[in-house]
Amino acid sequence: MLRRLVGSEMCIRDSRNSDPSDIAVTAAGGLVGEVVQIWRPRELNTHETEWGFSCMSYEISGALGIKMANPDKEVIAFIGDGSYLLYNSDIYSSVITDTKLIIIVCDNGGHAVINRLQLFKGGKEFNCLFESSNTKKLVGVNFAKHAESMGAKSEEVSSIEELEEAFKRAKKSKVTYVISIKTHSYQWLEGSAYWESPTLELPKTKENKEALKLHKDCLLYTSDAADDALRV
């Protein structure tokens, strides 16, 4: 069985193989945290992350606008399969306007970062991953062929080594190039910060009690750290 990659592995390799002027774009899901920690900008204005409202699918349309403003630079959009399925028609826009993009689709089987948040907060999986949702027939999407149907060049890869070679081909391409790769649904980048979002009060399961304790401990730590900073 194919080992599903963690998104950070992919970001590391793409960052290493990019040029200093390349612009990385991301917006929603786990990729925001992973790209911010892993991608290494070497010039000003080469990293665009949509924070605030976690605007799903901004990745492609945002990358299109950035490329229009920077026609001589490579623009690389990192997007999850969930965001891709919500809105992807600007791939077609990029093709018909001759506005070349590189798009990396990380296929982790749904809205995996919210599924991880559900579990992290003491809950259970609920309608985030396609395989654990109320589906009658699970159909895998071929993102490479879908992008190809809109005029882009595309390929699906299954390893970091294949990704590196595909990325080189994408850089040489004159038209929008989409690379699809399967990534892990549950594993996450090790280094991270606490995500302060509400924790379930009910039901009083073992997982829920542990999540509540962690939430309160982190809030107390944050409050004490803020007080210490004010006293300095």
How does the language model describe each region?
Residues 7, 27, 81, 180, ...:
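Acidic active-site catalytic centers that drive phospho-/nucleotidyl reactions
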Residues 16, 21, 207, 226-227:
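Intrinsic-disorder/low-complexity regions
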Residues 8-9, 13-30:
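Active-site pocket-lining segments that scaffold enzyme catalytic pockets across diverse folds
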Residues 1-12, 221-232:
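Single conserved hydrophobic/aromatic residue that forms the stacking wall/gate
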Residues 34, 38-223:
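Thiamine diphosphate
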Residues 3-4, 16-17, 40, 68:
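Generic structural signal for beta-strand residues in well-ordered domains
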